Amino acid sequence: MAKSKILALTLCAVAALSLSAQSKTFKIGYLPTSIGQPNTNAWQAGMMRVFSKEPTVKLVALDPQLSAQTQVGMMDDLISQRCDAIVLQPVDAAALSGSVRRAESEGIYVVTLNTATLQPHTASVQMADIAAGYLVGEEMGKQIHGRGNVAIIESPPGATLGVNREKGFREAVAKLYPGITIVGAQVAEGWKKENAITIMNSFLQANSELDGVFAVNDNMAEGAMIAAESAGRLAQIKIWGANGQKSTLDLIEQGKIAGTAYNNCFAQGELAAKIVMDSLAKGRLASIPATTDIIQIKPFAAMKDTVSQIPQQDRW
């Protein structure tokens, strides 16, 4: 069970309480799906905007390299270290549920980023993924004039973030554009650009007419762009991503990618850190929550005529 709200992200929404008056050192684990990705780096930078002001807070970052099994082991390690809170981006929402339950049963707050586990926990700060996919479907449909063939480059199984983005996209196409046909959908393992290149090449070979492609994250959208450009068909295909990383925004400005559902990951990380701080100020977690408090951030359609509205300092 979860209770959720969608908001246009403003950092005044949560004012973090200070822990500096307390004598103990607070250890906070950061466990994304992979260290070194634009979004996971931006989340960490956003969190440090909050944590660096607190001399009693220490952040421990671990890299499971996109492996749910490794991530479960690292959760066990953070629990054994007696972390006070863990900020988690689960590789698999089901596979990490047992780890989250164990952490919170031992009094450790868990805040997830982008994907909530099936196990209820303190909070989850997410892009509104269904809304993001719907937004992409709506805007792509306008760009291709409500008709044509489109394809989807999907997320790995178990990644509810990608599943929800695809769900929203399909809902928009079905509701708004009866003249659009989804001609293919394939999973890009590991969300990787090189896998998306291979999938896009297969779409191009199978479809002499292809008008749009939705890749459920920006890395994969960039892979689709590379393949379409190499085939000499980029001008005919509207390629969309989701997340809003800086490299994709640059390609939108160049006219090579049609758009992305943008999320300010710096601010998202900052908000997650403020939730952690407020939770720790209450003392150790007394009991496992019955529901997850889900904060969903409204996406922004970054296209060539709107991308300039995103300030440089908010590009990650």
Go through the PLM ranges and name each one:
Residues 24-26, 160-161, 172-174, 271-316:
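Hinge/cleft segment of the Venus flytrap/periplasmic-binding protein
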Residues 93-131, 135, 139-142, 149, ...:
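Flexible loop/hinge segments that line or gate small-molecule binding clefts
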Residues 76-79, 84-104, 169, 184, ...:
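Hydrophobic alpha-helical
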